[in-house]
Each structure stands twice: as structure tokens, then as C-alpha cells.
UniProtKB/Swiss-Prot annotation:
Catalytic activity: tRNA(Arg) + L-arginine + ATP = L-arginyl-tRNA(Arg) + AMP + diphosphate
Organism: Shewanella halifaxensis (strain HAW-EB4)
Protein name, UniProt field: Arginine--tRNA ligase
One Pfam family linked to the record: tRNA-synt_1d
Gene: argS
EC number: 6.1.1.19
Keyword hit for Protein biosynthesis: yes
Length: 581
């Protein structure tokens, strides 16, 4: 309905241009918004006020001209002018009911799908050889929910798990493995089962022994040069580390697979060419022996230029170098229209610099969009980054196990007589959903406080509340299996029926925002409001005990569409649903 309203206004504006009221070359972005107060209609626009200067008339006069030139539409009941010149559109109830019937019988809930694009989504991207920790959660689940939404909207999505599988840490691990195998033979590989301890021990040796550190750096060079022994060990480290990552992805319900992994090492052979191409264009400068690029737009607080370091004085490459190589690959090999980077907001300056440099150096197509989808930090209840009681980093697996345990206690308290196997399965779904939803429901650009108590509550905008809301709606159909809905249609008569129908019709607008701005919290907020609208409807409008058969069937259809929308929305967030809680 929103896009239809915009189309009506566009036709009216063209008519005013043809009549000479508005200059023919005047360009206006027609903004249409949902009203907050239904007494002001369903949609409102400030287009008349935007045209004031161009038309040389007052806004209310222009508003009337726009209304007079609107095409006839069966979707619009009436149009009114409000305040200084707002135009309010009231949508016809029958048109809304018809839209809901289309949604009910559609795989995509009746959405108008946009022109398909190829979208690269860079997310999760942990450093290998270490266990994933809570700091990896946000990129992983926010990125995955946006991926699901993009695919639902018909886009071709190329997942890219840009893992940190290259660099000094692997030299440390290789050197430490050499020491272990010299002492213990091939059995030393068993110590890799605890990657975190293995890495920690290698780091201690690296920090304490100059000889070990020198050998580690030498092994990095050998690895980068293609040494067969180093590459064999490197692949072992990566394989074990990736297996750990994918066990967590499966547990989290994240759609990343091994085929989506394209780490830093994939671009190793391209890095020298990146440097050479920047040099050939005269973009490189030297600073303390390093090769850097200065861009006029980026300066520090003192007004001094901030460099993008491309190659260190010792010949080593940095994140900027591999990011530029990856951008070139994503533009010119994958032919993407957009590339979305779900990376911590603290990397904002880095991405601003490399995105600008890639365009300046013509490494990427001019029309391709590169977007940093930054996010804030996940903090403990003290407002500081989430840590263990001893101050250490919280392993992601430990967080998920704790969520399982707490969810099991919660579900058992609600259902003391339930079978243990069913309790465990419900607790698994509730635990994972609660962790994910607690994050996804927050604006990704904001820091947020992680609280098990809040996220496992059945009150407020939480996963348990929404999962229960879905089971409540689904439960209606278990009691209405004998009702034949084949000839039923939706009728909106009661105010709460109209409110629920209006909320259901907003799903497409929310999805457009989610895929355009990478904001899962918009979908979370919508689902919470939808569950609330259904609750109000259910209290005011008896479904199975409706006064007429026609009304009962209509309300069952509204309930069916609500259940379908809730389930689809939760699925797009990467959450499983339950038929019973």
C-alpha cells in the first residue's frame, strides 16, 4: 500500500508539471510514512511543503492541487489535508482485506520483490587457531539474519567468511608445534584439541624467547613462500579451527558453510599486485620506511593526514592490503552490486579509508556499493565489555551452554510434568533463541547490556514472549481442525480486526528497511508489535465463539496469517519456532 500511495503521488506531481504549476525539471523524493495516529489516516506525506518554493504557492493550496490530480484508486477511501499542508491517506478496508488474502496465499506474504541484486555479505570472520568468543556473536548472527532477509527478498547472496587464517599467529603455532613434535613425535597433534591452550602456550614462548620469536617470523615467511611442510601444518590448524567454528554455527542455526570461507590467505598472491598498482598510479608515499597512501579527506585531530598503511617497512602486508584485494575480487570476479561488511563500529575509519581508496584507484566498479554495517559492543551488567568473573574473555560455547542450562530450568518450572526429552528440546530452542534475539532486537549501532534474566523473561520484547505468542496462535488451529476455510475470506469490521490487519500489512515495509539498512531490530520490533496487536484482537474478538460463521472463518484467517507472519519473521532472524511450550 505504501508503494501504491507513492505511485499515486508521483502521477499527481507529473500532472502538475504538465500544467506548468511545478517546473518540469523539479526533482522531488516522494516520502510517504505510516501515521502514528489512525485518526490521521494510514499514510501521510509532506510533498506539498516540499513544492512550496518551486510552485510559488502556500502548502495547503498545493496539497489541494495534488489531491485534485490524484488518479482514481480503489485502495484509497479518502484523502485529507492536515495542519500546514500534510496530505493524509485513508486506506479502504476492503482493499486492505484483499491485500491480506493475497499475503495469506503467497510464499512471500504478498511482498512486491525488488529487482534482484548480487550482494556479498562479509560476516562472522573470526581469527583462526583460537576459539570463538562472545565478541564474534554480533557479526555472526546480525550478518546471518540480513543474509536470510536478502534471500527472502529475491537477491542472490554470496556469503564471505573472511577468516583470519594468515599472519604472525601461525608462525607462533608452527614454531611451537615443531618443539612439541621434536619432544613427543606425531602424538603432539593431539594437543590441538584444545586450541586456546595451544595458542596461549605458543604466545608465552613468543613473548619470552627472542630465539623462538625469530623462528616464528621465519616460519611465516616460509609459509607465505609455499613451503610444503609449513603449509601442511597450517592446513591442520585451519581444519581443526574451522571445525570448531562450524560446530558453533550449527548450534546457533547460522547458515555459513565451509564453502563460504574465503580467508585472508586467499588473497596472499594478489597483495604484491595491489602495491604495484597503487604505485603505478602515483598514489603511494613513503613514511618511516612503510608504503602508505594519504587521502585529503582523512586527518587526525591536529589536522595532519592519516595514512592507509599498505606495506610495512619489513615488507609485511596489513589488513588494508588484503581488504583492497578482497574488494577487487568481489567487484570484478563476483560482480556484486553491493558488499556489506558486518564488522565492529571501531573499524569505521578503516573502512571509510579503504572504500574511498578502492574507488580512487579504480580497483572496483564505480556503481558498486560498499557498506560498513558497524555494530556496538556486548557488555556485562556493569556496562563494560562482557567478561568472565576472573576478567577473561567469555568463550561463545560457554555462553551457549549457560543459556541452555538456564532455559531448561525455566521451561521445567513452567512444565514440571513434561517428558525430559521434550523439555530438553524446548530448552535448546528457547536458549539459543533468547541469546540471539537479545542481540538482534537492539539497534546494531548501539552497545547493549547482556542479561540472562532479561533475555529469558516471558514479558517484554524477548524471544520467550514471541515463541509463546506463536504457540498461542498456532494452538487456535488445533481446536479448529474441522472448520472448512476453503471458501472463507477476510472481513475487517471490528476496530481490533482493522488494527491487526494494518499491522500485518506493514511486513513488506519492515523487510525493505531490514535489507536496505541491515537492521534486524526493525523486524524484531515489528514482530513484538504484531504479537501485541494479535493479543488485543484475541481479547476483543472471539474467534471460535464468534457470533457468525462468516466472522469465525474471517478471524481464523487473520489468525492464520498472523501465525504465518510470526513464523516467517522469526525464521528470518534465524530462530526456530515451537508448537508447544
Amino acid at each position: 500500500m505504501k508503494s501504491h500511495t507513492q505511485s499515486l503521488l508521483a502521477e499527481s506531481l507529473n500532472a502538475l508539471k504538465q500544467q506548468g504549476i511545478v517546473p518540469a525539471d523539479f526533482e522531488a523524493r516522494i516520502q510517504v510514512d505510516r501515521t502514528k495516529d489512525k485518526s490521521h489516516g494510514d499514510f501521510a506525506t509532506n510533498l506539498a511543503m516540499m513544492l512550496t518554493k518551486a510552485a510559488g504557492k502556500n502548502p495547503r493550496e498545493i496539497a489541494q492541487l495534488l489531491i485534485d490530480n490524484l488518479p482514481e484508486s480503489a485502495h484509497v477511501e479518502k484523502v485529507e489535508i492536515a495542519g500546514p499542508g500534510f496530505i493524509n491517506f485513508f486506506i479502504d478496508d476492503n482493499a486492505l482485506a484483499n491485500q491480506l488474502m493475497v499475503a495469506l496465499n503467497s510464499d512471500h506474504l504478498g511482498l512486491e520483490l525488488p529487482t534482484p541484486q548480487t550482494v556479498v555479505v562479509d560476516y562472522s570472520s573470526p581469527n583462526l587457531a583460537k576459539e570463538m568468543h562472545v565478541g564474534h556473536l554480533r557479526s555472526t548472527i546480525i550478518g546471518d539474519s540480513v543474509v536470510r532477509a536478502l534471500e527472502f527478498m529475491g537477491h542472490k547472496v554470496i556469503r564471505q567468511n573472511h577468516v583470519g587464517d594468515w599472519g604472525t599467529q601461525f608462525g607462533m603455532l608452527l614454531a611451537y608445534m615443531e618443539e612439541l613434535r621434536a619432544a613427543n613425535g606425531e602424538q603432539a597433534k593431539m594437543e590441538l584439541s584444545d586450541l586456546e591452550n595451544f595458542y596461549r602456550a605458543a604466545k608465552v614462548r613468543f613473548d619470552e624467547s627472542a630465539e623462538f620469536a625469530t623462528r616464528a617470523r621465519k616460519l611465516v615467511v616460509e609459509l607465505q613462500s609455499g613451503d610444503e611442510y609449513c603449509n601442511k601444518l597450517w592446513r591442520e590448524f585451519n581444519d581443526i579451527s574451522l571445525s570448531h567454528c562450524h560446530e558453533l554455527y550449527e548450534r546457533l542455526g547460522v547458515s555459513l558453510t565451509r564453502a563460504d570461507v574465503r580467508g585472508e590467505s586467499a588473497y596472499n598472491s594478489d597483495l604484491a599486485q595491489v602495491v604495484a598498482d597503487l604505485d603505478a598510479q602515483g598514489l603511494l608515499s613513503e613514511s618511516n620506511g612503510a608504503k602508505v597512501v594519504f587521502q585529503d579527506e582523512f586527518k587526525n585531530k591536529e589536522g595532519e593526514p592519516l595514512p592507509v598503511i599498505i606495506q610495512k617497512a619489513d615488507g609485511g602486508y596489513l589488513y588494508a592490503t588484503s581488504d583492497l584485494a578482497a574488494m577487487r575480487y568481489r567487484s570484478n570476479v563476483l560482480n556484486a552490486d553491493r558488499a556489506l561488511y558486518f564488522v565492529d563500529l571501531r573499524q569505521a575509519l578503516h573502512f571509510q579509508q579503504v572504500f574511498k581508496l578502492a574507488k580512487t584507484a579504480k580497483f572496483v566498479r564505480e556503481e558498486m556499493s560498499f557498506e560498513h554495517m558497524g555494530f556496538g559492543t556486548m557488555n556485562g551488567e556493569d556496562g563494560r565489555p562482557f567478561k568472565t568473573r576472573s576478567g577473561g574473555v567469555v568463550k561463545l560455547i560457554d555462553l551457549l551452554k549457560e543459556a541452555d542450562t538456564r532455559a531448561l530450568d525455566l521451561v521445567r518450572s513452567k512444565n514440571p510434568d513434561m517428558d525430559e526429552a521434550e523439555l530438553a528440546e524446548i530448552a535448546r530452542v528457547v536458549g539459543i533463541a533468547s541469546v540471539k534475539y537479545a542481540d538482534l532486537s537492539k539497534n546494531r549501532a548501539s552497545d547493549y547490556i547482556f542479561s540472562f534474566e532479561q533475555m529469558l523473561s516471558f514479558e517484554g520484547n524477548t524471544a520467550p514472549y514471541l515463541l509463546y505468542a506463536y504457540t498461542r496462535v498456532a494452538g487456535i488451529f488445533k481446536r479448529a481442525q474441522d472448520v472448512d476455510l476453503s471458501d472463507a475470506t477476510i472481513i475487517l469490521e471490528h476496530e481490533k480486526e482493522k488494527d491487526l490487519g494494518t499491522k500485518l500489512a506493514q511486513f513488506g515495509e519492515v523487510m525493505t528497511r531490514m535489507v536496505g539498512k541491515g537492521q534486524p531490530h526493525a523486524l524484531c520490533g515489528y514482530l513484538f508489535e504484531l504479537a501485541g496487536a494479535f493479543s488485543s484482537f484475541y481479547e476483543a474478538c472471539p474467534v471460535l465463539a464468534a457470533e457468525t460463521e462468516e466472522s469465525k472463518k474471517s478471524r481464523l484467517l487473520l489468525s492464520q496469517l498472523t501465525a504465518k507472519t510470526l513464523k516467517q519473521g522469526l525464521n528470518l532472524l534465524g530462530l526456530e519456532t515451537l508448537e508447544r511450550m
